[in-house]
UniProtKB/Swiss-Prot annotation:
The gene is apt. Pfam families: Pribosyltran. GO terms for cellular component: cytoplasm. CDD domains: PRTases_typeI (cd06223). Keywords: Cytoplasm, Glycosyltransferase, Purine salvage, Transferase. This is Adenine phosphoribosyltransferase. PANTHER family: ADENINE PHOSPHORIBOSYLTRANSFERASE. The lineage of its organism: Bacteria, Pseudomonadati, Acidobacteriota, Terriglobia, Bryobacterales.
Length: 173
């Protein structure tokens, strides 16, 4: 596998001063980098039965469908409100300064479906935790939460306690 960290551009003071942004577009444009991410996630989850890979808007949509294909599973998008055409279930969750809402089609996850949740980044864990609650409320079983990058200093993994959490890359600042 290529050195994935070397393919990620670090952008200081984006989107606001004091934030160091990890830009994955440089990793995505490199075929070995993109393949390395999908292969790394696939290798971790290959021995777990996965019915559905759920991708969180927006960058989770980049990785989740490719991983679903690699695992022989289906793909379900979780989106911001009013982006899906059929009847949806929704969850509103707390952010540091307010709330946010996620939706998925009501018929997307069946009772007992084994669901792997995928996103590009684990920060505080709020969005991933909300997605896991949505899956469980729909009768699904969360078999794991997979991320390309984990910002360990934000302790999102602790918020997801009780779930199998895996990240390919960890940053401590």
């Amino acid at each position: 596998m290529p050195d994935l960290k070397s393919l990620i551009r670090e952008v200081p003071d984006f989107p606001k001063p004091g934030i160091l942004f990890y830009d994955i577009t440089t990793l995505l444009k490199d075929p070995s980098g993109f393949h390395g991410v999908i292969d790394g996630l696939k290798d971790h989850y290959r021995d777990i039965k996965v019915d559905t890979v759920l991708g969180i808007e927006a960058r989770g949509f980049i990785f989740a469908p490719a991983l679903a294909y690699a695992l022989g599973a289906g793909f379900v998008p979780v989106r911001k409100p009013k982006k899906l055409p059929a009847e949806c279930v929704r969850i509103t969750y707390d952010l540091e300064y307010g709330t946010d809402t996620l939706e998925m089609h009501k018929d997307a996850i069946g009772n007992g479906h084994r669901v792997l949740i995928v996103d590009d980044l684990l920060a505080t864990g709020g969005t991933a935790s909300a997605a896991a609650r949505m899956v469980q409320d729909a009768g699904g079983i969360v078999v794991g939460l997979g991320f390309v990058i984990e910002l360990t200093f934000l302790a999102g993994r602790q918020r997801l306690n009780g779930h199998d959490v895996f990240s390919l890359l960890q940053y401590d600042k």
